[in-house]
């Protein structure tokens, strides 16, 4: 993941302007999910926003594949605001500890005792080797868990401790099946610069009673409807629908395209997300 820090007298106003969710009144130690949009409503990226304990300081956690694009876009939008935008992605990293034993693991293996008191989508700040670490009760798996942010050197040490303790390493393929079964979107599949949050069914993360980039288009889509929308499909046979497969109506007319498809371990069925015409 990418870690971008925003600070300065206009930090709250600026982040609220580029972020679809509402951060005013959002307390330090809390985490919010939302998106950054272009004026036409297309999604620049989806991200987590952390309100830090120091006033007018925010951490924006963006998708790793979008770091350079996101940072350039955020910098461009910031020119009219009194803020400092710093990309720490080259020096910071993240480890996600997820699953039913996540709390026990961060307590017993890593000694992060305060983590047990965290509610979902909250965080606290700790130290590892005398340097800052963010311990966040968040994740992208549909499971309980924690995401740990700190310097690359610390991340390597923490990773080794977890592996030595018998924690199973999992890659993005595993993560992708879990997020999919949990109904969570992935940028590049269910969200993109040509797919809006409303089309992706994420309107609950767009607070249309405030101003933000892309707000007018999203408000119109919510009021008037959209030409396409994201749906879930259950496959009747054992075939696995893959991304980019066409979705056809009964008469053979293509009405959409698969965005993500897997054999669901939980359901023992083939299922997919698809973007279809309305």
Stretches found by the model and what they are:
Residues 22-77:
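Well-ordered mid-protein domain cores that form the structural environment of catalytic cofactors
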């Amino acid at each position: 993941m990418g870690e971008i820090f925003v600070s300065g007298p206009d930090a709250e106003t600026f982040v609220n302007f580029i972020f679809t969710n509402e951060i005013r009144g959002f307390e330090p130690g809390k985490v919010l999910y939302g998106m950054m949009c272009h004026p036409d409503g297309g999604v620049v990226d989806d991200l987590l926003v952390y309100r830090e304990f120091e006033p007018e300081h925010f951490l924006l956690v963006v998708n790793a594949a979008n770091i350079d694009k996101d940072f350039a876009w955020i910098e461009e939008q910031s020119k009219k605001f009194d803020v400092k935008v710093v990309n720490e992605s080259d020096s910071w990293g993240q480890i996600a500890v997820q699953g039913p034993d996540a709390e026990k693991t961060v307590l017993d293996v890593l000694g992060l005792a305060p983590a047990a008191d965290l509610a979902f989508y909250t965080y606290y700040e700790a130290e590892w080797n005398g340097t800052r670490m963010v311990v966040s009760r968040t994740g992208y798996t549909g499971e309980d868990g924690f995401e740990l942010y700190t310097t690359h050197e610390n991340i390597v040490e923490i990773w080794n401790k977890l592996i030595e303790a018998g924690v199973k390493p999992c890659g993005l393929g595993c993560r992708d099946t879990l997020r999919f079964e949990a109904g969570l979107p992935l940028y590049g599949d269910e969200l993109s610069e040509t797919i809006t949050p409303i089309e992706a069914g994420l309107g609950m993360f767009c607070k249309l009673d405030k101003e933000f980039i892309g707000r007018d288009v999203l408000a119109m889509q919510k009021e008037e409807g959209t030409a396409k929308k994201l749906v879930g499909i259950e496959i009747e046979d054992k075939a696995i629908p893959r991304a980019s497969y066409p979705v056809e109506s009964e008469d053979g007319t293509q009405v959409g395209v698969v965005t993500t498809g897997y054999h669901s371990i939980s359901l023992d069925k083939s299922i997919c997300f698809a973007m279809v015409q309305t």
